[in-house]
Amino acid sequence: MQEKLDLVIEGGWVIDGLGGPRRRADVGIRGERIAAIGDLSAAPADRRLDAGGRIVAPGFIDTHGHDDLMFVEKPGLEWKTSQGITSVVVGNCGISGAPAPLPGNTAAALALLGDSPLFADMAMYFGALEAQRPMINVAALVGHANLRLAAMRDPAAQPSAKEQRAMERMLADALEAGAVGFSTGLAYQPGGVAEQAELDGLARVAAARGALHTSHIRNEGDAVEAAVDEVLAVGRRTGCATVLSHHKCMMPANWGKSAATLANIDRARAAGVDVALDIYPYPGSSTILIPERADQIDDIRITWSTPHPECGGQSLAEIAARWGCDAVTAARRLCPAGAIYFAMDENEVRRIFQHECCMVGSDGLPNDAHPHPRLWGSFTRVLGRYVREAELLTLEAAVAKMTALPARVFGLADRGRLAVGAWADVVVFDADTVCDRATWDAPTLASAGIEHVLVNGCAVFPQAPPSHRPGRILRRDASIAGAPEFSR
């Protein structure tokens, strides 16, 4: 007698995440895993969900999140589930929920994570996640800035041999606790003062344990080519798998340089460097407000300000005019603060997106009072604007970029694909209507066209379970990890 299924999603078009053509099939789920795919019209099941001709796909994997502390503070994560995200990689740009800095040490970039205290080490961070249970799955990186702040008395200096060993030991402990790798934020301090020996030392620790290095590179403007090459060289010297975070070329003088940076990435891959990259599908970036940039970019919008919260959502130029000062002075008065910088070319973003090893990472900042719309709309924007409207890729190829590709790059076993035995992370969406609705002026509007989202077999959208959060902590399986030609 056939064992009963818990749920059958029937009447949909299945896209398995691996890039192949969609097919008409039912998906059967038992417990937390997919138990059957095919014609399940006669299969016994406790529940049936009529997909009504919609797309049934693997849940999306957000490769670049800053939700590190949100799993404890606001575990509902509606900004993720409402756009079909079932897993996220946190700890990016060199900052993470652990380890906590030594007393007296701090860094401006930590404000991106919010005001909650950090955890002493990654083991304690993961313990808190296990106790709280996230709504979606979480893979975590440990931040290089955190390592510096926790190991060095003067994080603005070069590490002593003892401090370098301490950072490497902390990294090894974090990887042992479950981190999938480490991240650098070389455009921020204190990571920006790190030199080759320091980065190579950490990358060797990661490589020896099958982990990876993701990097917010040192410069995304005039020196973007050199900054890309710097990180590729770390991977080449150490054998550490590498991800270039939110790759972009900022400022009009640098638009078009992605042709060179992508060519350099391809040459590195051909030479044996395991490298991938990600983008968010918008022509504006967002991070902390940096006064030194205020007179370099014409269009800057404030997302939050501690001394002037009333300025959230307003243009820096308008604020400066109202205050009767220049933009740099206004920015200094607003800090600590966050901002959106409109300095990217949409056509270039689209070119980068089409690279075969490019994934999608929202880079969303959930603590911002007036966030960048990428927080709520990145994945549905790809489906609606890049696929349906612009026809940059087939729907199947775009889904692969958001599912199987990141699962391979980050070594997330049995994720990112619809197959018997895989974890039941599933999104059901209408290919004809799916799109982002979040805008620069209304950045927290939920997406259109996402109809059902399941995490490990449990429905989390449109209605989250009242008392159960089904997410898991994801560890890296080095045996399946790597950008496509490096996967085993």
Curated annotation (Swiss-Prot):
Pfam families per the record?
Amidohydro_3
What are its GO cellular component terms? cytoplasm
Specify the enzyme's EC class, one word.
hydrolase
Q: What is recorded on activity versus pH?
A: Optimum pH is 7.5.
Q: Where in the cell is it found?
A: Cytoplasm
Please give the family membership noted in the entry.
Answer: Belongs to the metallo-dependent hydrolases superfamily. N-acyl-D-amino-acid deacylase family.
What is this protein called in UniProt? Answer: N-acyl-D-glutamate deacylase
Which organism does this sequence originate in?
Alcaligenes xylosoxydans xylosoxydans (Achromobacter xylosoxidans)
